[in-house]
């Protein structure tokens, strides 16, 4: 029995002798949380979802506000294995259920109907459930999801089973043993997701780890590769918090509030076919301007105009390719969006003009938080239009972010999106080339949940779901903000393609914005994770992504930075970024040896830009992925399904070293079946990835310009050719103006090149051309790969047949031997990157903010000074036992599993992973660590 000190209500909990001590600890811990919420968090809200106990609860001041029609109450009682759960004022929290709190109300196979195209099915629990489902936000056209196809007579290969448990809709799909699971969007951890669990709840996840369960974006989507290589995509089309449980082998489980449909894509012949089908529903990636595929240099922050100019000048002086320089939040006046600090950035138009003269673009940040300040034109105009998100009592919600107290636009309203788009249009007149939407989960300071109350109200458009609580719109807030920004940029320049980068997103965000993997750490672990994270986003419909190269938080070492740049230069989105109070993280900041590796890496990228740009054209027009796991080359091969240090850019395979002490030339490369020919640009280095081209392929290359604007139609065109077993190869090249929309009006050139060996001659010719753009008179340079870094070169004119004479077998063997010798010579003569700053046992990061040692009673904590504090280590002094964030989380959740059952454990992970519980624990230890009751 535990007595609530506030309302004298008894909380009856059944104790088990086996876990008695843990039980008492947790009961006391959460009694204090409920009773001391006001003192602990300065009247700030603490929200969590517990599906098997109550729907939505918010601890604020001395009451518990239960959303969804439940009135305020001062406490609530929990009675294990009772048929009703009541608040002290007698209001039922859950519907009456028989027996245990996890009793199943209903279950069965879901009913289906074909939609969209052949092989795509919608599943609902019942006709009533279908009618109760909210509109789709992920679909380009929500009506498509609601319209069954009448001429399709297929039946699905796999039928989901549903259960209604404790007010939750649980959907399970069982697949054949040996199935590999991928997708889940922006997720840390391994590439193959079996054994993992993800919660779709957009979260400001600074310094996330490999086990973090909620990051900045939500993709309730799983890609399953069956044992025979066929693939199936499964979408839980809900915007609410959703658990994706992949802990059981070959089993997919979704848990969320009802009602939501399940959409399956396939099974199709390959994972690429599934992603193409998904793009028909959720849309393809926007066509990026070509300059956005170059290298981007960012920093939180370049503090003033002169420093930006200095960085730009240094890139050109050091002959390091770069296309974009970014301005983080400090360019603003007092962090007010759409303003410029008059002292530090007095003339943004002149700055942009200067950058443009150097061939550089400028991208500027815009956050959703608008300072609550009369006289500030953005606040005044938004208030006049009444477009702010509201609290449950109808007042504008005010939360603290960078400017201080802020209001937040309600992007679920067309009027608010139009208002924001007009602001963006005016902002672009300063010469802004691109916009960066940050903090749009939305992140809010000084709250344990790091976001706004779920009880806040959005007055959404009917086609989005109408007026709903924030819990419904939270996961799509970033998508809708990115959409508004994108539309504002189109208003400003109808003949320029917008470029928007968004931190938060949802399935379908690729229609409006690129993304990155958030606030990572300068560690070898995060370098490793960056590859599967980029690939998972691509496998979830977002092909334009990349990490903060070098790591955002912490000081990279020279070797870590150089290795990361080598890999990052091959990602679809290529940007270096670091946080304030770290050392400089520009390519020249780590010594001459690292600078040279960065130069070589970025020159590689710029050579490959014609190929990368072509991949994005195919992604935009056909929904094909850009960067893919290497099992895409042979989905039937189970040995390829967990490879995390290699990936494909079309037929180009990038093999990277992700271990600190493992140089690339010492590694054994696991290649897919078939012909894979190694090559380089006479730039091989132990810290750069190895490159292979698949037999049967042709890719186009360009000179390594300093920026995209230097390229010309009359530049030499280089074709890299790798013949297959039949002596043939084929590839495409897409060309247009690199910006604008003429390509939609036939103003482009799509060339299919072919190569074929006949006897001792290989002929290279144009097989097909699409588009009205005329072929320029330019030289054609063909390199025919022989393997072992050997090649035969020939010159001709683009558009004319070029014939290459193949030497004898002995001469080819000698060329291969010579190529291998030259490769070894380049490796041995390269200057290794020193790493004297990376001490033994250290993961490669020096925290940019010195941890503060704090002690409370029997506990010692290390906290990184930050907004609200970040706990990085805990130790129980009497036992000298350290507790990492994950380990201590497991202890707490284990107790919850024993006390309240499986669903409660899931609910607490869904909230905020380990940081939530540890933040609570820290606050309690600080208040009660020395108390006898604790």
What is each residue range found by the language model?
Residues 10-31:
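Hydrophobic alpha-helical signal peptides and transmembrane signal-/tail-anchor segments
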Residues 92-95, 99-688, 693-694:
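Catalytic-domain carbohydrate-binding cleft regions of carbohydrate-active enzymes
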Residues 123-125, 654-657, 762-770, 858, ...:
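Short, well-ordered beta-strand segments enriched in hydrophobic/aromatic residues
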Residues 664, 682-686, 795-838:
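Solvent-exposed, conformationally flexible loop/turn segments
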Residues 696-801, 823-825:
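Accessory, solvent-exposed terminal regions and/or long lumenal/extracellular loops of proteins
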Residues 836-934:
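Surface-exposed acidic/polar loop and edge beta-strand patches at domain peripheries
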